[in-house]
Amino acid sequence: DRENMQASNRVLEDLAMHDELTGLANRTYLHEYLTGCFEHAYAEEKLLGVELMDIDFFKEYNDHYGHLMGDRCLKAIAGVLQKIQIPGQVFCARYGGDEFMIVYTGMTVEQIRRISEDILREVRMLKIPHECSRCSKYVSISQGVFARIPMENNREWDFTSRADELLYKAKNCGRDGICLSTEKSSDKCIEIK
C-alpha cells in the first residue's frame, strides 16, 4: 500500500510540473529550474542562455483552423523541443499560450546558436500548412536568444526579459528567424535558409 501511495505521489508531482497539453515542463517548474541554473551559472561563472520562441501568427492559425488544430500544432512544436532536450544542458518548457522557453547551461554561444537553428529548421520541416501567415505558407517560429555569464547585478528575470526583447526584434526582422545577443555582441538577426 505504501509503495502504491509513493507511486501515486510521484505521478501527481509529475503532473504538477508538466504542461498537460504538450508534456513539456510548465511555467512553475521552469521558474524553479531557471532560478537554480542562474545561481549555478553565477557561482561558477558559466554561460547561461535563455531562448523565448513563439509561433508566428498563431492567433490567426487558431481562428482559421480551430482550437483542435491549434492544439495539434502546439503538440507538434513541443515534439521538436522534446527531441532536442539534453538533461542538464537543454531544458524546454511551455511558457504560456504559444510561447516556449529553452534554458541552455554548460554550452558555448556557438552550440546554443546551432541548436536554435536546428529548432527553426525542424519546425519548417513539419510543413504544417498556415494559409493565414504573412511570412510563410507553413507554420513558422520566431526566436529570441540571450546568452551571457550572469553578473552580480543580474537576476534570472533579466535574462527572460532580454530574450523577450530579442524575440520581438526577430519578429520585426520579418519573423521565421532568430535574433541572438551575447554580452560581447550586439543584437543580431540570423537569417536561416
What do the PLM-derived regions correspond to, one by one?
Residues H67, T105, V109-E117, E131-R134, ...:
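Catalytic-core segments of nucleotide cyclases and related cyclic-nucleotide turnover enzymes
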Residues R2-M5, N9-L12:
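Heptad-repeat alpha-helical coiled-coil signal-transmission segments
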Residues M69-Q89, E99, D118:
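Active-site-proximal alpha-helical element of nucleotidyl cyclase-like catalytic domains
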Residues R10-E32, M53-H67, K75:
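Conserved nucleotide-binding and Mg2+-coordinating catalytic segments in signaling enzymes
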Residues D54, F58, I77, Y95, ...:
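Hydrophobic framework residues that shape the active-site pocket
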Residues V90-R94:
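A short pre-motif secondary-structure segment
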